[in-house]
Amino acid sequence: MTIILKPGEVTLSELEAIYFNGEISKLHHDTHLVIERGAQRIAEIVAGSEPVYGINTGFGKLASIKIDADKVTVLQRNLILSHCCGVGDPLAENIVRLIMSLKLISLGRGASGVRLELVNLLENMLEKGVIPVIPEKGSVGASGDLAPLAHMAAVMMGEGEAFFQNIRMSGALALEKAGLSPIILEAKEGLALINGTQTSTALALAGLFRAYRALCGGLLAGALTTDATMGSTAPFHPDIHILRGHYGQIAVSKTLEKLVEDSEIRAAHLRGDERVQDPYCIRCQPQVMGACFDILLAAAKTLIIEANAVTDNPLILRNGEVVSGGNFHAEPVAFAADQIALALCEIGSISQRRIALMVDPAVSYGLPAFLAHNAGLNSGFMIAEVTAAALMSENKQMAYPASVDSTPTSANQEDHVSMACHGARRLLVMSENLFTLIGIETLIATQGIEYRAPLKTSTLLQSVMECLRKNIASLKEDRYLAPDLHQVHILVREGHLLSVLPETIFPSLSFQ
């Protein structure tokens, strides 16, 4: 399936399909005229004598140096090669595809002045699977994601490296094998390719999509734990949350209420339970997870605006005027990434507390210590709980806001930067940790519910448990647990456990 991108109207679901499903993307044909109009305006400037930043001048601190018309192609080539300073491991293919798609959207607005030929090459690279090797580190998220995007642009010139059919090779060879020809960049085209927030935005979007999946997984795990510990569902009553009024809290309380509906375990202790209230990790799930959902929604709103934005500099306005500005500064993306990091941290924090509740016989309401059969001889989930604590702590350290850590660059010309790129990139690590943490809770809670037999959990939760047990057996006696943790990580990360439930049971991230 090919996703047709209409700049200004691209949706979260379209970008999610590119990220998760590897869908090919290309611009709507309606963009061609405005792209060509912008390119014509750049050609007029090059033919004239007036110096215009980025078109016939140097860059950054060297912006005052005028470049002759016969040197503009050399200028653009030198710009790309000199900016290929990324370090670290290559970004994953789905991230790079998202970066390239976001760059298409920005160029498709016609304010960057590139030729249609350049846009076509980018589209063809996506279609044929020429994936530039983009090192993960090197951007401070202002004046655009210069280094990572330069590595993308280098392949378009026949330089750098790319993956083709899962083999790493030179950019020139990758283009040749795909039946494509490198492009000679004309005036401003190199700058248009690297001046933008597409790397930071792609990473933040990936973090958002993964955080939402973790939120849903956390709600599911929390519902399982509520039944495993014979917790009260009264705190999920909708009127409680309507009285407070927060959208996210109301939405997730409905999810939790539906997940535990018709549970025999819950019905068995509606009366005669000496506990008056549950610990906060059970009772305050709607408040905590609702707040997490709210900030994910706020981040989503920022990121979909940014995904449809022109973040180049200078820009060609509708009247043909070329104006320098600062749309390349990724502060909105940095803030969104910091918000997502908070949600990832808190989803994990409350999950870890629920794990601790279940493994402690003093507070688990009848569950054996560490959910172990013949405790003492067997240790059960004792160290799985420690692993969860380690992952929670690691995420807490990474939740420190990246956006507050500006430093001057480029001889103090670019003296305030966003740090959006690594602020967004850490979300991938945090979400990986969180998928495992939620998986550990899901494993323990499932075993806890099995201890409540012959009482059954809800119909929905029973279907989730059946899916889990098709992949991971119940822990009857101690065994090598690492494969179980790896398997449950995959089940949570890939959304397999969520897939057995009605899609409508979870609140939607889409607001469009």
UniProtKB/Swiss-Prot annotation:
GO terms for biological process: L-histidine catabolic process to glutamate and formamide; L-histidine catabolic process to glutamate and formate. It catalyses: L-histidine = trans-urocanate + NH4(+). It is an enzyme of class 4 (lyase). Contains an active site 4-methylidene-imidazol-5-one (MIO), which is formed autocatalytically by cyclization and dehydration of residues Ala-Ser-Gly. SUPFAM superfamilies: L-aspartase-like. Its EC number is 4.3.1.3. It is found in: Cytoplasm. Pfam families: Lyase_aromatic (PF00221). InterPro entries: Aromatic_Lyase, Fumarase/histidase_N, HutH, L-Aspartase-like, Phe/His_NH3-lyase_AS. The keyword RNA-binding does not apply. Pathway: Amino-acid degradation; L-histidine degradation into L-glutamate; N-formimidoyl-L-glutamate from L-histidine: step 1/3. GO terms for cellular component: cytoplasm. There is a cross-link at A142-G144 (5-imidazolinone (Ala-Gly)). GO terms for molecular function: histidine ammonia-lyase activity. The modification 2,3-didehydroalanine (Ser) is found at S143. It comes from the Bacteria. CDD domains: PAL-HAL. Keywords: Cytoplasm, Histidine metabolism, Lyase. NCBIfam families: hutH (TIGR01225), PRK09367.1 (NF006871). Belongs to the PAL/histidase family. This is Histidine ammonia-lyase. It comes from Bartonella tribocorum (strain CIP 105476 / IBS 506). The lineage of its organism: Bacteria, Pseudomonadati, Pseudomonadota, Alphaproteobacteria, Hyphomicrobiales. The gene is hutH.
